[in-house]
């Protein structure tokens, strides 16, 4: 990524740099997220529906990258989602806890540990929403 005339451009392996806005809103969101992570070292970052604009087959790669970067920068991520596809890729995070808001549950919040989440991921018919 390079700053050219006050705009970010990205090297995509071709002979020219493309302005970042040519790459779509999903990529732009990820670039901003990485910038926010760089500025949030030793802190927390709240991310709403990270999966929006990202091709679902790339969720696992994205999660592994964010997990690695979050450890490197010591940033704790809190991510909201309504996407089963995204949840099914959460095993890429080395440390993981999932919270589900449910007014019928005592206290209104259900907490799932890694074991419970992996059981959910294995049940292809499950829907957490």
Residue map of PLM features:
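A generic structural-conservation signal
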Residues: 1-2, 79
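Structural signal for conserved beta-strand scaffold positions within catalytic alpha/beta enzyme cores
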Residues: 2-3, 100
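Conserved ABC ATPase signature
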Residues: 4-39, 44-57
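C-terminal lobe/lid and adjacent interdomain/linker elements of RecA-like ASCE P-loop ATPase modules
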Residues: 60, 64-129
């Amino acid at each position: 990524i390079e700053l050219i005339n006050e705009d970010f451009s990205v090297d995509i392996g071709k002979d020219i740099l493309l302005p970042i806005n040519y790459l779509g809103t999903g990529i732009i969101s990820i670039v901003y997220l990485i910038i926010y992570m760089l500025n949030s070292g030793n802190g927390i970052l709240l991310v709403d529906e990270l999966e929006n604009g990202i091709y679902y087959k790339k969720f696992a790669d994205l999660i592994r990258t964010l997990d690695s970067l979050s450890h490197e920068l010591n940033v704790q991520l809190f991510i909201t989602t309504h996407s089963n596809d995204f949840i099914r890729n959460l095993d890429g995070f080395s440390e993981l806890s999932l919270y589900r808001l449910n007014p019928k549950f005592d206290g209104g919040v259900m907490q799932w540990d890694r074991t419970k989440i992996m059981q959910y991921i294995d049940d292809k018919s499950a829907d957490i929403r």
